[in-house]
Amino acid sequence: MNAMGSDYIREVNVVKSARVGYSKMLLGVYAYFIEHKQRNTLIPAGFVAVFNSDESSWHLVEDHRGKTVYDVASGDALFISELGPLPENVTWLSPEGEFQKWNGTAWVKDAEAEKLFRIREAEETKNSLMQVASEHIAPLQDAVDLEIATEEETSLLEAWKKYRVLLNRVDTSTAPDIEWPTNPVRE
């Protein structure tokens, strides 16, 4: 038997009222003394009543569980799974597409971020195409150096070298408005 005169204390799920919502509390012989004094008041939308057993009272706590907010620094979606207020660095508004930044009230296009991305993308493309050109040039150059190249190989070597020079001249800072030279295989 405990101090309250009951050894039948157990945790159960209780619906106090349709207007109060769901809570968990300890019930025993004297559990009827633990009452929600405001059970006839409506709980505002976005809140839930939580019973504090230390204070023997109900408190309203923000409830955004199951909702998605967006980090204003990264635009990443964050799923809310716990009770309590939202972090300060989030918004309900989702970014529309890529290269968005938060201006304090809305998502706006981040032209600078997009430009930097396009330049990096163009540099990667240029490096990849230069590698392909060098791979084609190497065996053709070997054939010429060994004086065993056919006319077709000599012609292809010249075309690939010209392509590589033109490719090297591409200004990636103008991305995405780049006119790439034509690959000799495609001519």
Swiss-Prot record:
Entry-linked InterPro entries: Phage_T4_Gp38_tail_assem, TFA_Chaperone
More about this protein: Encoded by the cryptic lambdoid prophage DLP12.
Family listed: In the C-terminal section; belongs to the tfa family.
Protein name, as recorded: Protein TfaD
Species this protein is from: Escherichia coli (strain K12)
Gene: tfaD
